[in-house]
């Protein structure tokens, strides 16, 4: 049985990725500019998103680009926890299984949503962009989270939604379950050695926790 669970945040615990995509195109439409395509946006998920940031900077300028991310951070507090992740977190909480978040976002950017959802009652450790030199697909976020939980990577299960995130987890030595969303379901996971994909909270609990107890 795994002794700890490390979650990605955006697109895994809450569906912020679709939310941001819609906000970006709302702002581009407002200024009469061409929308970002879904394929282009999907390439940015789970990592640095430098191409997306550069595109928005060129099209909108720095101030208007930052307004997009400010609106995203302020309105994400209204998004619910993904049902399957809530089930898993509830199980881990009552089973005294430590939980962490390893996110390529800045901790301060996710804090309003983190606080609104009451995630402090579940999550023991949060590792963000400001805590590492390199973000996903580098394994550094996961290695840092594992270290702060004081466990070995092989004792920890990662939950991810993107290729970049899953790559980071695997390269850090963790087993990973990939639960995709509308924005990541068409990514190519064929080179990812995941242990499970698109599983319900109940299935994760039964297969990777309850069954291993027996």
Predicted features and spans:
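Conserved phosphate-coupling serine/threonine residues in phosphotransfer and NTP-handling enzymes
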Residues: 12, 103-105
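A structural signal for short, well-ordered beta-strand elements
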Residues: 34, 45, 78, 103, ...
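Residue-level detector of anion-binding/catalytic polar loops
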Residues: 34, 98, 175
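Asp-based, Mg2+/Mn2+-dependent phosphohydrolase catalytic module
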Residues: 1-3, 90, 106-107, 111-214
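Short linear motifs at secondary-structure transitions and domain/linker junctions
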Residues: 18-19, 28-29, 56, 74-76, ...
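Conserved SAM-binding loop
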Residues: 13, 81, 99, 134, ...
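N-terminal helical cap/lid subdomain that shapes the substrate entry/recognition surface
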Residues: 2-87, 91-95, 111
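Non-catalytic, surface-exposed connector residues within folded enzymatic/regulatory domains
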Residues: 18, 35, 79, 104, ...
């Amino acid at each position: 049985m795994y002794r700890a669970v490390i979650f990605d945040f955006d697109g895994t615990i809450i569906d912020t990725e679709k939310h941001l995509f819609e906000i970006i195109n709302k702002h581009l439409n407002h200024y009469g500019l061409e929308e970002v395509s879904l394929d282009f946006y999907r390439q940015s998920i789970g990592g640095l998103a430098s191409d997306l940031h550069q595109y928005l900077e060129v099209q909108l300028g720095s101030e208007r680009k930052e307004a997009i991310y400010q609106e995203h951070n302020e309105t994400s507090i209204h998004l619910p926890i993904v049902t399957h992740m809530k089930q898993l977190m509830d199980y881990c909480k009552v089973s005294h299984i430590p939980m962490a978040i390893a996110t390529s976002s800045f901790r301060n950017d996710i804090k309003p949503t983190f606080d609104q959802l009451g995630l402090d009652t579940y999550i023991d450790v949060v590792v963000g962009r400001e805590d590492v030199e390199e973000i996903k697909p580098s394994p550094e976020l996961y290695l840092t989270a594992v270290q702060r939980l004081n466990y070995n990577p092989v004792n920890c299960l990662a939950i991810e939604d993107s290729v970049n995130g899953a790559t980071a987890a695997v390269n850090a030595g963790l087993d990973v379950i990939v639960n995709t969303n509308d924005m990541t379901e068409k990514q190519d996971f064929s080179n990812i050695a995941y242990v499970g994909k698109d599983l319900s909270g109940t299935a994760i609990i039964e297969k990777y926790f309850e069954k291993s107890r027996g």
